[in-house]
């Protein structure tokens, strides 16, 4: 995929990755190569690749079906990493990833694949810009910044603390 992008900047490659991000480790060398292309070419080239991986826990999958790998992969400059929380985020970020220049690691939270609480209306041709957070719950006492399926855990905690203590927690 990295080499194929070199022929034409209009080529965008989407790689449907492993069923579980846990199985991505043997391919991490290729990931590293893609993250280095921009720096290696002095800004002349960046691979237009979107790599999709199912990631995360909370599905009862055990040791090799619950890993969250973004922490290790964010230490390598040269890739954007996105991790949606709701259906509109998922659709919008995937469209933006596929249409943008550069390398994007698109992590899909497995726990939300069939989660009713993550379902939202998705407008046609909807995109979510990179680097723009969404306030999912307004509040004034404390701000929680989160992503992926833990957004839903934080929303539940915010609601509980509001009912029990009257605290207004913002969830971004």
Which residues make up each language-model segment?
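Conserved thiamine diphosphate
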Residues: 2-145, 149-153, 159, 169-170
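Alpha-helix capping/termination and helix-coil
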Residues: 161-165
């Amino acid at each position: 995929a990295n080499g194929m992008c070199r022929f034409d900047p209009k080529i965008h490659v989407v790689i449907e990755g492993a069923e579980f991000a846990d199985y991505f480790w043997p391919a991490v060398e290729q990931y590293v190569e893609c993250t280095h292309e921009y720096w290696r070419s002095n800004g002349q080239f960046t691979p237009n690749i979107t790599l999709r991986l199912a990631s995360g826990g909370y599905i009862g999958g055990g040791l090799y079906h619950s890993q969250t790998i973004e922490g290790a992969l964010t230490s390598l400059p040269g890739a954007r990493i996105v991790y949606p929380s709701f259906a509109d985020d998922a659709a919008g970020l995937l469209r933006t990833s596929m249409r943008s220049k550069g390398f994007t690691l698109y992590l899909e939270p497995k726990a939300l694949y069939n989660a009713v609480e993550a379902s939202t209306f998705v407008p046609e041709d909807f995109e979510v810009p990179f680097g723009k957070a969404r306030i999912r719950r307004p509040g004034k006492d404390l701000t929680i910044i989160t992503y992926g399926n833990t957004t839903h855990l934080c929303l539940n905690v915010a609601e509980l603390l509001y009912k029990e203590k009257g605290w207004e927690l913002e969830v971004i």
